[in-house]
C-alpha cells in the first residue's frame, strides 16, 4: 500500500503545472529612470553614455522621416543644436505607457532651453525600450 501511495504521489507530482521564473533579477533602473538618465547624458553631450543607454541599431520615426542608425550617437549633432541656441533640455513630464518583461514605452514631454534659460522648444516624444540582460535600453523614438 505504501508503494502504491508513493508511486501515485510521484506520478501526480509530474502532473503539477509549475511556472519556473528563469529571470528573477529585476532591471537596475525602471524605464522612466532610463529615459531620465538619457536626458542627463544628453545634457552632458556624453555620446559614450548615450550609446550605452540605447540599443543598436537605433531608430527615429519623425513624421514621414524614418531613420535607422548603427548607434544613437550617429543620430545626434550637438554642434548643430548649440548653433540653433540649445543649451540644455528639461523633462516636463514622463509617463510609462506600457511595460512587460521585455518591452516598455515611455512618453516624455520636454523643453529645450537656451543659455539665457528661456524655452526655445517644447515637444513630446515616445520611446520604445527593450530589456537587454536586465537593463532597459532605448531602442528608438517617435
Q: Which residue ranges define each predicted feature?
A:
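A mature extracytoplasmic/lumenal domain signature
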Residues: 54, 64-65, 108-112, 142
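Sec-dependent N-terminal signal peptides
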Residues: 4-12
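Short beta-strand edge/turn micro-motifs at domain boundaries
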Residues: 20, 120-142
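A short gly/proline-enriched turn/hairpin at secondary-structure junctions
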Residues: 58-69, 84
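Hydrophobic pocket/interface hotspot
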Residues: 38, 49-51, 58, 74, ...
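Surface-exposed, charged secondary-structure patches
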Residues: 75-118
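Short, low-complexity N-terminal intrinsically disordered segments enriched in polar/charged residues
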Residues: 15-48, 52, 60
Amino acid at each position: 500500500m505504501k508503494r502504491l501511495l508513493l508511486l501515485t504521489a510521484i506520478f501526480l507530482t509530474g502532473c503539477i503545472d509549475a511556472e519556473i521564473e528563469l529571470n528573477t533579477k529585476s532591471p537596475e533602473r525602471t524605464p522612466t529612470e532610463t529615459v531620465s538618465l538619457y536626458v542627463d547624458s544628453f545634457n552632458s553631450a556624453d555620446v559614450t553614455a548615450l550609446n550605452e543607454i540605447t540599443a543598436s541599431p537605433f531608430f527615429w520615426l519623425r513624421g514621414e522621416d524614418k531613420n535607422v542608425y548603427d548607434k544613437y550617437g550617429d543620430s545626434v549633432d550637438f554642434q548643430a543644436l548649440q548653433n540653433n541656441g540649445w543649451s540644455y533640455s528639461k523633462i516636463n513630464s514622463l509617463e510609462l505607457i506600457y511595460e512587460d518583461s521585455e518591452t516598455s514605452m515611455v512618453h516624455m514631454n520636454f523643453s529645450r532651453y537656451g543659455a539665457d534659460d528661456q524655452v526655445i522648444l517644447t515637444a513630446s516624444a515616445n520611446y520604445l525600450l527593450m530589456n537587454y540582460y536586465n537593463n532597459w535600453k532605448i531602442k528608438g523614438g517617435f
